[in-house]
Amino acid sequence: MRVAKIGVIALFLLMAIGGIGGVMLAGYSFILRAG
C-alpha cells in the first residue's frame, strides 16, 4: 500500500498549498472511506 500512501501525502501537500480547509476535510473523509 505504499503507492496509496504516497498518493495521500501528495493530496495533503496540494491541499496544504491551496489552503482550502473545506477541500482538506472532504479529501480526508474520502481517504478514510476509501481506506
Swiss-Prot record:
Localization, UniProt = Cell inner membrane
The superkingdom listed in its UniProt entry is: Bacteria
The family annotation for this protein states: Belongs to the UPF0387 family.
Membrane association type? Single-pass membrane protein
Q: Is tRNA processing a UniProt keyword of this protein?
A: no
Which Gene Ontology cellular-component terms appear in the entry?
Answer: plasma membrane
Which keywords does UniProt give here?
Cell inner membrane, Cell membrane, Membrane, Transmembrane, Transmembrane helix
Q: Where are the transmembrane segments?
A: 6-26
Please give the chief subcellular localization of this protein. membrane
The record's listing under InterPro entries reads: UPF0387_membrane
Name assigned to this protein:
UPF0387 membrane protein YohO
Organism name? Salmonella typhimurium (strain LT2 / SGSC1412 / ATCC 700720)
